[in-house]
Every structure is written in C-alpha cells, then in structure tokens.
C-alpha cells in the first residue's frame, strides 16, 4: 500500500531532481558544528540560496558585511561528458525554462579552516576586497530595484568569488561623508555669551549712591560738592572704583612754594639736562704751534729764534759761558765743536785768512 505523502515526495523529486544536490553541495565543505538549513520548497529557493551563501561568507570572511539577497549572482555547474550528467543538465535546463523559481546548484570554491590549523585560511587580498572593506561598499542597497541575475564562471585561481556584486555595488555606491568630530568643532560655540572679555570690561558702571561719599571729610570745605554728582556713565572707557579717592592735584599745580622741602630738594633742571661736552686729551705741541721763541735781554729787543734750543744757546753765550773749543789759528773760542769747524770751513778764521793773504791785519 502506497502512502499519498510518499508519492507526493517522489513526484516532486522527479520534477526537480537537483534540489537535494543543491542542499548537499552547499553543506559539503562546512564544519559539522554549523547547522545546515533544510531544503526549501521551489517558491523560496532563491532565499534559501542566499541564506546558505550568507552562512558560508560569515565563516570565511567574519569581518565583512553580507550583501543583500537580490545582489548575489547565481552560479552554473559545469557539465560532464557522461550520459547521466548530460541528461541531468538537460532536465535542469528544461526546468529552469518553465519554472522561474528554479534552484541552481551552489558550489563553494574555498576550503573552510579546520580545527588543527593555527590560523584561518583566507584568500589573498585584492583590489575588489579592498573596495568591499570601505564603509560605502558594506551598505546593502535593499531599497533599490531588483537587478537581473548575472551568471559568473569561477576560475580556480580567482581570489574573489563575487565580482559581479562588487561591480554592481560600485556603480550605485552612495557618497560617504564623515560627520565632523566633536573635538574638531570650534570651541567658541561652548561659550554661553557672545561678548568678548574686552567688551565686558568696557561696559559702564552705574552706582546707586554718589561716588566718594565715605571720603567727604578728607577734602577741604572749599571743594565744590557739585563735582560729586557727576554722571560717570558718560565715560565707559575709564571705569573707576567707588572706594578709590582721586589723586591730589596740588602736587602737579604750577604754583609751588619755593620754601617747600620738595622745591628745596629739587635740583636745577638746566644742570640735569645740560649736554655733556667731551674733553679732548692734551696733544703735544708741534713746531708750528705755540709762541715763537724770542730774546728780550742783552739788548736783543725781541730777537727771534727758530727753535727753543737755539734760544738757550744764545742765553748761555751772552751770560759768559766757559770756552771749551778754541781755534788754533786765530784763537777764537766756541761752545761747540761744530761751530768751530764751520768757522774754519766758511773762511771766518783770521789766521786762515792771513795765511792766504786775504786779510789786511
């Protein structure tokens, strides 16, 4: 006796002979600890493929975000030359032509890591994976329209199993604009007031009582009390404290008593501000500078001499110095030997003149 439920399952397997192979191919290389979802009916076959791929991608690439269900491309299985595989392929093509929800086979190109390995086996980095690691590529485009499926044939040495998904996501990639950090914002926004400290200082001070009221007894009675009622709010640039008395202007008045100790101790302003004249050091007198040597004694009447030495010699001669050099021919005395020699050479010697017959004596 045949059960109606078993007959229904047999009929479904005949119509879709690759449904069991799809579930087996998706779970062949997965660890035993991962729960494999049960095969789904043909209406939900596309969602089942996306769920199995998401489980495999979460195991192989734990740090990458998963794509949306409509962005995963389907994969076709290569056919063999045997009769059984050709029959199965023709049956699957016929089923895919008449059934829009037909489930294609899924095959994992990578081997998952085993517990004996120290490090997980990951594919080499590529430019496509670098693009997937960007924040904009990880955002799933669930709100956009569903794109048609694209068939991709995998090669054994290719590092990225989903190039079509990356190309689709790079075309419709949104512009990623990072928000400014809190530390980069200007600090002027945290101030409660918009005025600068300098503007706070320039605000006028208003007093309820007239200033300098507790110091009225210090000043003389001749002081006009109307000055105390001056409106100081008209001078905002120079605020004054009410407890500081004004300076005594009598010290700066021009009428100062000469007998006051301040006037007596103050020095003469002309002596303080007189320019200092530089004093040049004494220089030795030259022959051209100074008075001309003259002799006013011995009846010379101011005779001039070319040098001071000649004047001294003249004085010694007039005062009767002792004769040291005497001419042998005429007996004339001289104070210097040079004068005696010059006396002979110039022909002034009387004895020489006599010998030559020049003189009359």
Curated annotation (Swiss-Prot):
Feature: compositional bias, Low complexity: 73-92, 183-204
Entry GO MF terms: zinc ion binding
Uses in biotechnology: FR901469 inhibits the activity of 1,3-beta-glucan synthase from Candida albicans and Aspergillus fumigatus. With minimal inhibitory concentrations (MICs) against Candida albicans and Aspergillus fumigatus of 0.63 ug/ml and 0.16 ug/ml, repectively, FR901469 displays greater inhibitory activity than other 1,3-beta-glucan synthase inhibitors such as, WF11899A, echinocandin B, aculeacin A, and papulacandin B.
Subcellular location: Nucleus
Gene3D superfamilies noted in UniProt: Classic Zinc Finger (3.30.160.60)
Superkingdom as given in the UniProt entry: Eukaryota
Disulfide bonds: none
InterPro entries per record: Znf_C2H2_type
Location of region: Disordered: 70-94, 175-211
Zinc finger (C2H2-type): 325-345
Keyword entries, A-Z: Metal-binding, Nucleus, Translation regulation, Zinc, Zinc-finger
GO cellular component assignments: nucleus
GO BP, one annotated term: regulation of translation
Family, as annotated: Belongs to the GLI C2H2-type zinc-finger protein family.
Function: C2H2-type zinc-finger transcription factor; part of the gene cluster that mediates the biosynthesis of the antifungal antibiotic FR901469, an inhibitor of beta-1,3-glucansynthase, exerting antifungal activity against the pathogenes Candida albicans and Aspergillus fumigatus. FR901469 is a cyclic depsipeptide containing 12 amino acid residues and a fatty acid chain. Positively regulates the expression of the FR901469 biosynthesis cluster genes frbA, frbB, frbC, frbG, frbH and frbI.
Protein's name according to its UniProt entry: C2H2-type zinc-finger transcription factor frbF
Protein source organism: Dothideomycetidae sp. (strain 11243)
Underlying gene: frbF
């Amino acid at each position: 006796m045949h059960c109606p439920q078993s007959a229904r399952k047999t009929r479904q397997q005949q119509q879709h002979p690759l449904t069991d192979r799809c579930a087996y191919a998706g779970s062949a290389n997965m660890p035993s600890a991962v729960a494999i979802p049960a095969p789904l009916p043909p209406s939900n076959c596309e969602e089942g493929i996306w769920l199995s791929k998401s489980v495999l991608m979460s195991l192989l690439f734990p740090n990458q975000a998963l794509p949306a269900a409509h962005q995963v491309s389907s994969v076709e299985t290569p056919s063999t030359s045997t009769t059984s595989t050709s029959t199965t392929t023709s049956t699957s093509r016929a089923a895919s032509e008449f059934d829009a929800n037909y489930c294609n086979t899924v095959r994992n190109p990578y081997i998952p890591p085993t517990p004996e390995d120290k490090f997980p086996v990951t594919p080499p980095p590529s430019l496509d994976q670098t693009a997937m690691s960007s924040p904009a590529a990880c955002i799933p485009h669930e709100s956009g329209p569903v794109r048609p499926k694209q068939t991709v044939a995998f090669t054994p040495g290719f590092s990225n199993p989903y190039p079509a998904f990356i190309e689709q996501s790079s075309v419709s990639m949104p512009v990623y604009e990072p928000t400014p950090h809190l530390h980069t914002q200007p600090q002027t926004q945290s101030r409660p007031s918009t005025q600068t400290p300098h503007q706070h200082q320039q605000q006028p001070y208003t007093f309820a009582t007239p200033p300098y009221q507790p110091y009225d007894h210090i000043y003389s009675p001749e002081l006009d009390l109307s000055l105390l009622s001056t409106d100081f709010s008209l001078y905002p640039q120079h605020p004054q404290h009410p407890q500081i008395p004004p300076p005594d202007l009598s010290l700066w008045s021009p009428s100062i008593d000469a007998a006051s100790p301040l006037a007596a101790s103050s020095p003469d302003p002309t002596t303080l501000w007189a320019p200092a004249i530089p004093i040049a050091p004494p220089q030795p007198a030259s022959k051209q500078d100074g008075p001309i040597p003259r002799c006013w004694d011995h009846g010379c009447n101011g005779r001039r001499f070319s040098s001071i030495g000649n004047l001294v010699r003249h004085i010694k001669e007039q005062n009767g110095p002792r004769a040291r050099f005497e001419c042998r021919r005429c007996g004339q005395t001289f104070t210097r030997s040079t004068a005696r020699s010059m006396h002979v050479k110039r022909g002034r010697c009387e004895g020489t003149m006599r010998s030559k017959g020049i003189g009359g004596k």
